[in-house]
Amino acid sequence: MLQEGDTAPEFELKDTNGKAVKLSDFRGKKVVLYFYPKDNTPGCTIEACSFRDDLLKFKAKNAVILGFSMDDNSSHRKFAEKHGLPFTLLCGTKKVAEKYGAYGNKGIFGWGIKRTTYLIDEKGKVARVFQRVKALGHSKEILSGLR
């Protein structure tokens, strides 16, 4: 698991439209990188819609939202369209999730993405880590952590 002050690992992943997105594309901005298990599931929908509803507040704090799950871009596109999600959803890989400590054993749910969020500062350093995230109210929790 990454710690505050660590350099956030670089990645290059596809977005909803198949476009390559790198973490370094966002240097100079704060990044909310949130890992979620699956598109269109109850908790993940609550979490994504709360980020959507608070998006202007994040923009006012020079922050971008990046959602990460291991769903493909077709699934992401349907999820984004269904819920009006205006931020980037990344087609994540197990390798990248492991680098961020967001992949592992979830007990009775088996192995997969563990709901985790990283606040990454303008220079690419981890500013905050949120583990075992509760979907409801998480967006507000993140906003309070942004300076």
Question: Where are these predicted regions, by residue range?
Answer:
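Chalcogenol-based redox active-site neighborhoods
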Residues: 1-147
